[in-house]
């Protein structure tokens, strides 16, 4: 009975603890969502700045290194 103004049977403390738990899970969910958004942003950035130019260079190299097929006259020896 020390420092008790109302006999609430712990409902205020229980409500405060549940509120803290809900805030913790809310912050955790927001962090997870922001992490996923960061992954999509990084993927978009690298796709535009790294993957597409490297792929274009690879296609140019592949076109440059293309070997012409052997003519049919050479095979009829």
UniProtKB/Swiss-Prot annotation:
It is a single-pass type III membrane protein. One of its GO terms (cellular component) is host cell Golgi membrane. It is found in: Host Golgi apparatus membrane. It comes from the Viruses. The keyword Secreted does not apply. InterPro entries: E_protein_aCoV, E_protein_CoV. Residues 1-15 are virion surface. Coiled coil: none annotated. Keywords: Apoptosis, Host Golgi apparatus, Host membrane, Membrane, Transmembrane, Transmembrane helix. Residues 37-77 are intravirion. GO terms for biological process: disruption of cellular anatomical structure in another organism; viral budding from Golgi membrane. Homopentamer. Interacts with membrane protein M in the budding compartment of the host cell, which is located between endoplasmic reticulum and the Golgi complex. Interacts with Nucleoprotein. Plays a central role in virus morphogenesis and assembly. Acts as a viroporin and self-assembles in host membranes forming pentameric protein-lipid pores that allow ion transport. Also plays a role in the induction of apoptosis. Belongs to the alphacoronaviruses E protein family. This is Envelope small membrane protein. The gene is E.
């Amino acid at each position: 009975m020390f420092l008790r103004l109302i006999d609430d049977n712990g409902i205020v403390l229980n409500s405060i603890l549940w509120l803290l738990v809900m805030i913790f899970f809310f912050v955790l969910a927001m962090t997870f969502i922001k992490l996923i958004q960061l992954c999509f942003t990084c993927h978009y950035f690298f796709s535009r700045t790294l993957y597409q130019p490297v792929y274009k260079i690879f296609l140019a190299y592949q076109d440059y290194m293309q070997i012409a097929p052997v003519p049919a006259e050479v095979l009829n020896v």
